Regions:
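Membrane-interface coil-to-helix junctions
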Residues: 1-55, 76, 81-99, 201, ...
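Short juxtamembrane and helix-loop transition motifs at transmembrane-helix boundaries
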Residues: 7-14, 35-40, 59, 64, ...
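Hydrophobic alpha-helical transmembrane segments
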Residues: 26-27, 41-59, 225-244
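Membrane-embedded helix bundles of polyisoprenyl
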Residues: 56-62, 70-149, 158-176
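Cytoplasmic juxtamembrane regions at transmembrane-helix boundaries
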Residues: 65-66, 244-245
């Protein structure tokens, strides 16, 4: 899906008018503006490299308190997983860029910076995710949940984080509201539903990082017993860590 043309055409209007256009907004506009300086082919390469680098480094930093070995393992899992592989095969570079922002968002929200500094830095690290509606929403949810996980959380501060997170979704929320009448494809939910690519059902497939709907984007390792056993073991470790076991 990650297709770029050498000379992208200017947007027909300031506001996208179809569901498909909204789905790629404001990424298309940013790509068009940047194409005057950075060729679209180079933009693609930068997005892919940045997505993997940011995901690995961010996840490693997120668990750095657990030691170098844990940080290295977390970074490896963040960039070498069924989820990342599936999105690369689908050509979902912008989606991976949003995914890569999540550990950085958690780091910033849980930092000891002053509120204003934290909010400003939060917007900065969330900008790549906000290039697509999916990335913006997931980044917003992550920011709020990260704030709620703080020991010194307050309702007012969580509300402030939610307000900041809502702001970076405005580039696509406002066009959707102002244009109006833009309906979603009724066949979309069925076409893009979770797939049980592990043989263990859709929920286990998703929890193990898989579940992509396109058979061509499902790694062959998803049907390998050894790989599945390793994935289940990793899932068990994650659950144990969350429960504090």
């Amino acid at each position: 899906d990650f297709v770029a043309v050498p000379e992208p055409a200017a947007p027909l209007s300031l506001l996208p008018t179809t569901a498909s256009a909204l789905r790629a907004w404001p990424l298309d506009a940013v790509s068009w503006v940047a194409s005057g300086v950075v060729p679209t082919g180079v933009q693609q390469q930068l997005i892919l490299v940045a997505a993997l680098a940011l995901a690995g480094v961010g996840t490693g930093l997120l668990v750095r308190h657990a030691g170098a070995a844990a940080a290295a393992a977390a970074a490896w899992v963040a960039i070498w997983s069924p989820y990342v592989t599936g999105r690369l095969l689908l050509g979902h570079g912008p989606t991976l860029l949003g995914y890569a922002c999540l550990p950085w968002i958690v780091i910033v929200v849980r930092s000891s910076l002053r509120t204003r500094q934290r909010h400003l830095l939060l917007v900065v690290v969330a900008i790549p995710a906000s290039l697509t509606p999916w990335g913006g929403v997931v980044a917003a949810v992550t920011a709020v949940l990260a704030d709620l996980s703080r020991g010194d959380r307050t309702l007012a501060r969580s509300a402030a984080v939610a307000a900041v997170a809502s702001a970076w979704c405005l580039p696509w929320v406002l066009p959707a509201v102002l244009v109006g009448g833009v309906g979603a494809d009724p066949d979309g939910p069925a076409a893009f539903a979770l797939a049980g690519d592990s043989g263990l059902g859709t929920w286990f497939s998703a929890l193990m990082g898989g579940g992509v709907w396109a058979a061509g984007a499902q790694p062959l390792s998803r049907s390998d017993p050894v790989a599945l056993a390793a994935s289940l073991g990793l899932l068990g470790c994650a659950v144990a860590a969350v429960l504090g076991l």
